[in-house]
Curated annotation (Swiss-Prot):
Signal peptide, first to last residue: none
Subunit structure of this chain's protein: Part of the 30S ribosomal subunit.
Record keywords: Ribonucleoprotein, Ribosomal protein
Gene symbol of the encoding locus: rpsJ
Protein name: Small ribosomal subunit protein uS10
Length: 105
């Protein structure tokens, strides 16, 4: 049986702000759909929580502490059958600075 290897672009997005991440995902999916590529996603991945424990007092009172946390929200978008138009449109897409994008071909 001959199997055809299907071309796929996998885009991983990370951000601290969930709303910013969702708007970026919408822009990417709309761009892919406009260029006749099939976009699957955004698929939400588990949110990573990082908690920092800091002493409130600069000198003593170790009982008094404060907790800070950062939440990293993550999404995956798969684009199947991308054309050269799709890749050019994704390269020209203007996304916010607070979103980390990782692309795998």
């Amino acid at each position: 049986m001959a199997t055809l290897q299907q071309q796929k672009i996998r885009i991983r997005l990370k951000a601290f702000d969930r709303r910013l991440l969702d708007t970026s995902c919408e822009k990417i999916v709309d761009t892919a759909n406009r260029t006749n590529a099939t976009a699957i996603g955004p698929i939400p991945l588990p949110t990573k929580r990082k908690i920092y424990c800091v002493l409130r007092s600069p000198h003593v009172d170790k009982d008094s502490r404060e907790h800070f946390e950062t939440r990293t929200h993550r999404r995956i978008i798969d684009i199947y059958q991308p054309s050269s138009k799709t890749i050019d449109a994704l390269m020209k897409l203007d996304l916010p600075a607070g979103v980390d994008i990782e692309v795998k071909l």
